[in-house]
């Protein structure tokens, strides 16, 4: 979601699931197996099925749900009406961009997730004026918020319980702000930026997950390490590295199904609506490339497998994320 005065960046970390390590084996299954076999041999299939349901299935019967870290909120000051508002996602660069005009000030906001640097980068810039905003975290998890060092925002939390399995994962998300011009100040749980011509926000998240039976990791150390590795690197270099890594895979495939020049000039939402009554073969190609973009962003070597939502989820218990083997 994005508006002229609020930028919401929804945050996920692909190892943040509910619950903790557990053994799903039903302790009654072995003892019930001879009776199940006997019933099946005698043709009593329904009775055998009932016994399977009662004593043979995993405990709990459901998988744990994938969960959200929360949101990074950029609340702009001033409240003036925005004009010339434009949002876009460039599939070729994997950069989301927002442009708008607030009075005499033109604002540009860019957001991308960097595979090589394992961070989300946000760049806000202004011409004809300066930027002023408040940066904060929000989360439905059991969490706390604080600031560190005058320019860093920290979200620390614990995952939730599910189906009788206690939450055992700790997680942390950090956002560090670098401003050109102006100043950055902090209160207990927010950062405030004023008078800046441009601002870079680097976001890193981690959990205590190490493997399926080990959640003893140190998410605080991991996030500090990720952000420390970015120090001193110009934003343009970080952007270039992220784009090159994305294009290394994305540009391996091209698909041309034909074109409708008039349809291709429309905003994507209008183009989708019009496609029901208008021949637009290029829209199918766009969907194809969008799917590739999503998969490149949610499944890489060393990551968790993508679930039915890739890795994007703003809920604590969205049922479709339980089907994590579907991809």
Describe each region flagged by the PLM.
Residues 2-322:
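Aromatic-residue-lined binding/catalytic grooves and analogous aromatic/hydrophobic interfacial grooves
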Residues 323-327:
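Short "domain-exit" segments at the C-terminal end of structured domains
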């Amino acid at each position: 979601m994005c508006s002229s005065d609020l930028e919401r960046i929804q945050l996920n970390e692909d190892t943040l699931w509910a619950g903790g390590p557990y053994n799903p084996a039903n302790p009654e299954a072995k003892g019930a197996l001879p009776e199940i076999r006997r019933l099946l041999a005698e043709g009593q299939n329904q009775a055998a099925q009932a016994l399977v349901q009662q004593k043979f299935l995993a405990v709990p019967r459901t998988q744990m749900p994938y969960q959200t870290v929360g949101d990074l909120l950029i609340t702009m000051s001033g409240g003036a009406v925005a004009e010339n508002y434009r949002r876009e996602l460039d599939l070729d660069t994997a950069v989301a961009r927002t442009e708008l005009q607030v009075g005499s000030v033109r604002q540009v906001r860019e957001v991308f997730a960097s595979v090589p640097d394992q961070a989300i980068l946000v760049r806000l810039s202004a011409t004809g004026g300066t930027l002023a905003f408040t940066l904060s975290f929000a989360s439905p998890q059991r969490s706390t918020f604080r600031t560190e060092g005058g320019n860093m925002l920290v979200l620390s939390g614990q995952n939730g319980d599910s189906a009788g399995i206690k939450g055992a994962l700790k997680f942390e998300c950090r956002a560090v702000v670098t401003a050109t011009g102006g100043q950055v100040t902090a209160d207990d749980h927010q950062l405030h930026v004023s008078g800046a011509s441009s601002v870079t926000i680097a976001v890193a998240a981690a959990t205590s997950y190490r493997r399926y039976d080990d959640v003893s990791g140190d998410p605080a150390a991991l996030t500090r390490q990720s952000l420390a590795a970015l120090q001193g690197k110009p934003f343009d270099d970080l952007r270039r590295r992220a784009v090159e890594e994305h294009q290394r895979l994305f540009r391996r495939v091209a698909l041309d199904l034909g074109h409708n020049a008039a349809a291709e000039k429309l905003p994507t939402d209008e183009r989708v609506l019009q496609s029901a009554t208008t021949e637009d073969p290029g829209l199918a190609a766009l969907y194809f490339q969008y799917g590739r973009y999503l998969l490149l962003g949610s499944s890489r070597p060393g990551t968790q497998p993508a679930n039915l939502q890739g890795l994007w989820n703003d809920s604590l218990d969205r049922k479709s994320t339980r089907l994590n083997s579907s991809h």
